[in-house]
Curated annotation (Swiss-Prot):
Positions with a binding annotation for ATP: S235, G236, G237, V238, D239, S240, S241
InterPro entries noted in UniProt: Class_I_gatase-like, GATASE, GMP_synth_C, GMP_synth_GATase, GMP_synthase, GMPS_ATP_PPase_dom, NAD/GMP_synthase, Rossmann-like_a/b/a_fold
Every Glutamine amidotransferase type-1 domain range: 9-207
Chemical reaction(s) catalysed: XMP + L-glutamine + ATP + H2O = GMP + L-glutamate + AMP + diphosphate + 2 H(+)
Native source species: Salmonella newport (strain SL254)
Name used for this protein in its record: GMP synthase [glutamine-hydrolyzing]
Function text: Catalyzes the synthesis of GMP from XMP.
């Protein structure tokens, strides 16, 4: 019997903050399972989930508006600790008899919170002390409204100059509210506060660890599929690779991986995937060379969205044909991760919901009635990587920069041709190799090369050449929602440019993209 790693669990109710997924990731980092649900869940759903504690997230609305979101009243009757963050604190205060008002000044950015009285939430936690010995906390504020009167059975634990109730608490009921964001790194002791709430106040054990997650996933896969055969589309990306390794550990040769080589991958990537998963790890893997098929389908197409659809359609066609060749396959495995589940629920309903199967299968043939196996669907990306390391996958592969699903199909601008892909592959490999050599690869969030269908005059020796242009792109970002262009050293950029122009016959000019997001997107197409 594997240990029940879901035994202690935190429920996070999402009021729409951009930081809500970060709250969930922080709780997971503390070794405790949690789920993210929409704020309007029913009492029955909460009872069924049986949380050890509940966190109410921040949100963009104003609690003073008539129809603004409210926590289900049962949250405060369930007999478990509750932690309100920003909007979550405000709705807690209002629903329990306090008062919230719109503030004249919006408080955004760093603030110092002075701790006024003892509380289990912040006992022994401080960044500095006032002249008379009171603890101070450096926190990150982002709010317009503020609590102006707390419920009668609460106490004011901490304040700022403009916010009289920066922390409030009812120690007996174990209800806590903070007007700042403990989940962001700018709140220096935020992780300790979350740990205090989750581990001490809610008394959750650290059961959610990579090794235990693997044991649990393997047991669940075996229970779900038994002795049946499973098929997986393996791309060589993080999610499908970790899915393959988990399934291989659980069911061995009953897993068949199909690797579709679409001709739009990075330099030597197909060989690396086959070497690692076939030769090194011994997975049962079918290599399908399909470059000509993809490129002929893309011929003459310039529109980025149309290119994406063509690549997706042809992949499904090729994968289906291979699946039909295999006998007795009952299950399709997918590398769906928790943010996919949250996003698909949000796109359907406008908000996060309970974990459900995330059917992104596309167009499996009608005659193939397969069940779906999604061993990563409870996991965030950082957890998937940690599990991959535990399963023996190489660090460089797991922590590689993001690569788009359509691959070079959206990094060759306009029509995709084999000549362009070959040039781009070689130029990009030089850029990435130099980033690694200069110890810059892990200092940027994403770096890649784009092929521009533009010819430019160059000089090589005594002759002129009229060849293609590529653009280098490197960005720094935390969440990929916004990004700054990376200020790479000029001598480094010069070295990369010289190598590409000298070593890749067919490229005469290299430019560097200095656009932020917004207004530009990270990828060009």
């Amino acid at each position: 019997m594997t240990e029940n790693i879901h035994k202690h669990r935190i429920l996070i109710l999402d009021f729409g903050s951009q930081y809500t997924q970060l709250v969930a990731r922080r709780v997971r980092e503390l070794g405790v399972y949690c789920e993210l649900w929409a704020w309007d869940v029913t009492e029955a759903q909460i009872r069924d989930f049986n949380p050890s504690g509940i966190i109410l997230s921040g949100g963009p609305e104003s609690t003073t508006e008539e129809n603004s979101p409210r926590a289900p009243q049962y949250v405060f009757e369930a007999g478990v600790p509750v932690f309100g963050v920003c909007y979550g604190m405000q709705t807690m205060a209002m629903q329990l008899g306090g008062h919230v008002e719109g503030s004249n000044e919006r408080e955004f950015g760093y603030a110092q919170v002075e701790v006024l009285t003892d509380s289990a939430l912040v006992r022994g936690i401080e960044d500095s002390l006032t002249a008379d010995g009171k603890p101070l906390l450096d926190v990150w504020m982002s709010h317009g409204d503020k609590v102006t009167a707390i419920p009668s059975d609460f106490v004011a634990v901490a304040s700022t100059e403009s916010c009289p109730f920066a922390i409030m608490a009812n120690e007996e009921k174990r209800f806590y509210g903070v007007q700042f964001h403990p989940e962001v790194t700018h709140t220096r002791q935020g992780m300790r506060m979350l740990e205090r709430f989750v581990r001490d106040i809610c008394q959750c054990e650290a059961l959610w660890t990579p090794a235990k997650i693997i044991d649990d996933a393997v047991a669940r896969i075996r229970e779900q599929v038994g002795d049946d055969k499973v098929i997986l589309g393996l791309s060589g990306g993080v999610d499908s690779s970790v899915t393959a390794m988990l399934l291989h550990r659980a069911i061995g040769k009953n897993l068949t991986c199909v690797f579709v080589d679409n001709g739009l991958l990075r330099l030597n990537e197909a060989e690396q995937v086959m070497d690692m998963f076939g030769d090194h790890f011994g997975l049962n893997i079918v290599h399908v060379p399909a470059e000509e098929r993809f490129l002929s389908a893309l011929a003459g197409e310039n529109d980025p969205e149309a290119k994406r659809k063509i690549i997706g359609r042809v992949f499904v066609e090729v994968f289906d044909e291979e699946a039909l060749k295999l006998e007795d396959v009952k299950w399709l495995a997918q590398g769906t991760i928790y943010p996919d589940v949250i996003e698909s629920a949000a796109s359907a309903t406008g908000k996060a919901h309970v974990i459900k199967s995330h059917h992104n299968v596309g167009g499996l043939p009608k005659e193939m009635k397969m069940g779906l196996v999604e061993p990563l669907k409870e996991l965030f990306k950082d957890e998937v990587r940690k599990i991959g390391l535990e399963l023996g996958l190489p660090y460089d592969m797991l922590y590689r920069h993001p690569f788009p699903g359509p691959g070079l199909g959206v990094r060759v601008l306009g029509e995709v041709k084999k000549e362009y892909c070959d040039l781009l592959r070689r130029a990009d490999a030089i850029f990435i190799e130099e980033l690694r050599k200069a110890d810059l690869y892990d200092k940027v969030s994403q770096a890649f090369t784009v092929f521009l269908p533009v010819r430019s005059v160059g000089v090589m020796g005594d002759g002129r050449k009229y060849d293609w242009v590529v653009s280098l792109r490197a960005v720094e970002t935390i969440d990929f929602m916004t990004a700054h262009w990376a200020h790479l050293p000029y001598d480094f950029l010069g070295r990369v440019s010289n190598r590409i122009i000298n070593e890749v016959n067919g490229i005469s000019r290299v430019v560097y993209d200095i656009s932020g997001k917004p207004p530009a997107t990270i990828e060009w197409e």
